[in-house]
A protein has these predicted regions:
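Conserved phosphate-binding/catalytic region of the ribokinase-like
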Residues: 1-11, 33, 205-316
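Glycine-rich phosphate/adenosyl-contacting loop at the front of the ribokinase-like
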Residues: 1-64, 69-80, 242, 248-249, ...
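Short beta-strand scaffold segments in enzyme catalytic cores
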Residues: 50, 97-101, 110, 229-233
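A glycine-rich helix N-cap at a beta->alpha junction
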Residues: 77-93
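Short gly/ser/thr-rich secondary-structure transition/capping motifs
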Residues: 82, 121-126, 166-172
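Conserved phosphate-binding/catalytic loop of the ribokinase/pfkB sugar-kinase fold
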Residues: 90, 100-140, 145
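Glycosyltransferases and closely related glycan-assembly transferases
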Residues: 133-136, 151-163
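Conserved phosphate/ATP/ADP-binding segment of small-molecule kinases
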Residues: 159-163, 168-240
Length: 316
């Protein structure tokens, strides 16, 4: 617990440059599409952590960046968010980046993650005494699947009794979490990532997904599905929450990160699981309405949006 009596969340994972090119006309694959390019600091863990900090959680981040202009921008964004920056800078390397192409509706058509530096450098950082001390001082741990599997296992070992929350990042990276599913207090993912983890087919029903994840050792999860119902289960109880329709979706980037950050903030503040998920969905809905993966909103805006999220329904 920090001196300000805010619970402290120590996070390990991505903090890099997000580039997004969005078509302003109906997207045509394999062709040049008129559009708009935007870039901003992002990364799964970093986006979620900024949201949690907005909601009253003290935050510390361990990431990796290069000694370039982009790295300086990322460092400034971490400081601006009021997050303790325990990241390591490799002066001779380029900062990781994520580049996405969006269609005219703001949905991702394709994306490239240039993040080899995480693979090489993050596992070594977890052996540092400073990191062990930071984990010991935290109330909870948060990671994303930008870490390779061996680093995730090491972090789970360092956490000991502390809650561990994780973000799946992508279907390709979600499978890295398989060996620590039993250590997680909640895993945040979308339907595609859940199917990658379980090996189920595209037609799998919610109950099947829930049962397969439980059988794999994961006892708590939140699974988003775009405009479809969000599935959340906690031990023996499973819920669905229908997201309200969002007029004028600007950009889907960061919506899943916001879901994680908002839910984690609620859980760390003692909110019941199903209500914390509603808070996470509120943050996600607000994010969908902006061209930023980490928007800033007032408490009044948050409360107004929360009133639009329906109560959770038990999955029977």
């Amino acid at each position: 617990m920090t001196s300000g009596n805010k619970p402290l969340l120590f996070a390990v994972g991505g903090a890099h440059l997000d580039r997004r090119g969005q078509s302003t006309v109906p997207f045509v694959p394999g062709a040049s599409n008129p559009g708009i390019m935007r870039e901003e600091p992002g990364g799964g863990v970093f986006n979620a952590l900024r949201l949690a900090a907005q909601r009253g959680i003290a935050a510390e981040l361990l990431s990796i960046r290069g000694g370039d202009r982009i790295g300086e921008t990322i460092g400034a964004a971490i400081e601006s968010a009021g997050i303790i920056d325990s990241s390591v800078v490799f002066m001779d390397r380029a900062t990781p980046s994520y580049t996405a192409i969006l269609d005219e509706h703001g949905d991702v058509v394709a994306a490239i993650a240039d993040m080899a530096l995480y693979e090489v450098a993050l596992p070594r950082q977890l052996r540092r005494r400073k990191v062990r001390d930071a984990v010991a001082a935290a109330d909870a741990i948060f990671c994303d699947a930008n870490l390779p599997a061996d680093a995730l296992e090491r972090l789970a070992g360092l956490a000991e009794h502390r809650p561990i929350y994780a973000l799946a990042i992508s279907p390709a990276k979600a499978v890295r979490l398989r060996t620590i599913l039993g250590n997680l207090n909640c895993l945040f993912m979308n339907r595609r990532e859940a199917l990658a983890l379980t090996g189920l087919g595209q037609s799998a029903e919610l109950k099947e997904i829930c049962a397969a994840l439980r059988a794999a050792g994961l006892q708590v999860a939140v699974i988003s599905n775009g405009a479809g119902p969000t599935l959340a289960y906690h031990n023996d109880f499973a819920y669905t929450v229908e997201p309200p329709g969002v007029d004028g979706i600007a950009d889907v980037t960061g919506a899943g990160d916001a879901l994680a950050g908002g839910t984690i903030a609620g859980l760390m503040q003692g909110v019941a699981f199903h209500e914390a998920v509603r808070q996470g969905m509120t943050a996600s809905m607000l994010t969908l309405k902006t061209h930023s993966a980490s928007p800033i909103f007032t408490p009044e805006e948050f409360d107004a949006a929360l009133s639009l999220i329906p109560d959770a329904t038990l999955l029977r």
